[in-house]
């Protein structure tokens, strides 16, 4: 049985700073894509870390360092705080108001099927709002919603301000809009500590919903905004590939 040693930094302010920097240096995937010189970031933030006297001061320095990645999926957690990168939405005007939609478009007259809010709009247009891919979508929920829209001419799927969640729910929803095996995207794995150490991309596919399930093959408009994030973005990217779908 083979084994290898794992380098551990000292449990000190500088040891913890270096450990965090090294973990990202070896495992983070998007330095080149984001144009981040991680070595330059180290040189800039290490003196700030060296001046720290408490864990909370170090946390703040490390959080600012991670913000250089401009990545909403990179967080730093401690017993007293969790850091998030927010500027991907906080630096821009908010362009979605759920109450405005419920009041002026749905007139507070809507149905709820699990995590899906839905209603028939004028001119026989179906409207479905899905607020979070963390909320499970049941197959029965989808059958009920799509059956309700049987006479609709088109369908609006609103994923504005949807912060993402479970990729399984993305697949469950997309399967209702395809007729057969459909390319959904590509996955690439990091294979080593170098910034360019990646395996070849491999494709993954979604299959159409099982026989007997209600499908929708008429026109679809997907509404998204800057706060459509993570798994919700993946949903939009897959739906964009379908010929009956328009992204707004």
Residue ranges and their predicted role:
Residues 210-223:
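Short, conserved helix/loop micro-motifs enriched in His/Cys and acidic residues
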Residues 155, 229, 242-248:
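Short, well-structured beta-strand/strand-turn elements
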Residues 122, 215-217, 242:
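Short, well-ordered coil/turn elements that cap or connect secondary structure elements
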Residues 2-206, 219:
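Flexible, low-complexity junctional segments that flank or bridge functional domains
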Residues 224-231:
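Active-site neighborhood of thiol-dependent amide/isopeptide-bond enzymes
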């Amino acid at each position: 049985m083979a084994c290898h040693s794992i380098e551990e930094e000292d449990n000190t302010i500088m040891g913890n700073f270096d450990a965090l920097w090294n973990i990202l240096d070896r495992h983070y995937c998007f330095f080149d894509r984001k144009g981040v010189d991680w070595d330059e970031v180290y040189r800039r933030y290490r003196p700030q870390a060296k001046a720290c006297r408490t864990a909370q001061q170090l946390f703040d320095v490390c959080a600012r360092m991670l913000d250089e990645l401009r990545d909403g999926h990179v967080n730093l957690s401690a017993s007293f705080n969790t850091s998030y990168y927010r500027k991907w939405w906080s630096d821009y005007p908010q362009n979605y108001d759920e109450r405005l939609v419920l009041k002026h478009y749905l007139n507070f007259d809507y149905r709820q099927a699990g995590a899906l809010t839905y209603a028939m709009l004028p001119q026989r247009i179906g409207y479905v709002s899905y607020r979070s891919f963390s909320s499970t979508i049941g197959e029965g929920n989808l059958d009920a919603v799509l059956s309700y829209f049987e006479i609709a001419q088109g369908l609006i799927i609103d994923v504005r301000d949807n912060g993402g969640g479970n990729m399984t729910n993305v697949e469950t929803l997309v399967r209702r809009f395809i007729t057969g095996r459909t390319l959904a995207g590509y996955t690439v794995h990091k294979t080593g500590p170098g910034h360019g150490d990646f395996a070849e991309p491999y494709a993954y596919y979604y299959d159409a919903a099982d026989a007997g399930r209600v499908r929708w093959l008429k026109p679809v408009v997907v509404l998204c905004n800057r706060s459509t994030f993570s798994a919700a973005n993946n949903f939009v990217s897959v739906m964009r590939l379908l010929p009956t779908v328009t992204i707004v």
